[in-house]
Amino acid sequence: MPTWGEILGEFQPPNTPDSIRRKYLSQLASHVGRDVILYSTKWTDPSNVPPDVISITEEDVQGFMEVVHGLKNDKLDLILHSPGGSPVATEAIVKYLRKKFTHIRVVVPQGAMSAGTMLTCAGNSIVLGKHSFLGPIDPQFILQTQLGNRMVPAQAILDEFEMAKSECKDTHNLGPWLPILSQYGPGLLIECKNAIALSRKLAGDWLAQYMFSGQKRATHKASILARTLADHKKYKSHGRHLSRDDCRQLGLVIEDLEQDQILQDLVLSVFHASTITFNQTPAAKIIENHNGRAFVKLSGGIRLPVQVQNLPLPQAPKIPVQPSQAPAPALS
């Protein structure tokens, strides 16, 4: 299995980040006999990239349109590395991909959190390594507080409001609660309930329609699994890592990345090449197919669509340093 440092060793002139990444994407497609799309973002590397650049957004639909163009197969391997983002943007992506592909296998080389996990639920199966993880899908809200913007779980807002109702029956408790309650805008509680319901519905519908298709009581099984993934009270933190064993125990259809050594080598080579691209170029999000068509979002928000030119390769460091793998929060 190639390491990050071994792939870094290939990043020497005349090679470019694009040529190395695309070499392994092409080899991967040849090995699996399916179309391959990479969706990877710079979310596990320390940076000052704005969250909306690395999150799943409506703009990503354009990226997928770019890379789906010209693909002939009806089967897709989607390599996914994402902190999550907008559930409704994720829904748009799923609807688009499912118009084209009858079978989608989602390969997670490291992490797919939140709405990224929701996207995996739209696959027929999920490929995870020993080190791979998914996460809870409970929705989050960004609230403006006296301490600045904070990302707060929707369920925590609802629970806190119920706590306030109970404690404020004693009017002596109104004083401490007023600054907290004043931060809640009009309609927030309804929005929280709707967001939770939407996450459950989207994940449940996709699981029933695709992953559990043909199984007995598929809808019931999918509904229970979706509710579990969206249960903030169960996981306590939106950033919890659900391992391969955790996901299999929940009932997700999981394939082991290590079952096919060539597949593992190629997937991780693509993944390492993408993370090194993020380290050595301004790229912060890459949507790319095995034919070299790409939609690249730079850290400054600039987009580079269609057969993106090779990004310049700076002088490679003499001593490889493993990039940090700390996760970042997402909207859902």
What are these regions (language model features)?
Residues 1-332:
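Terminal-region recognition feature
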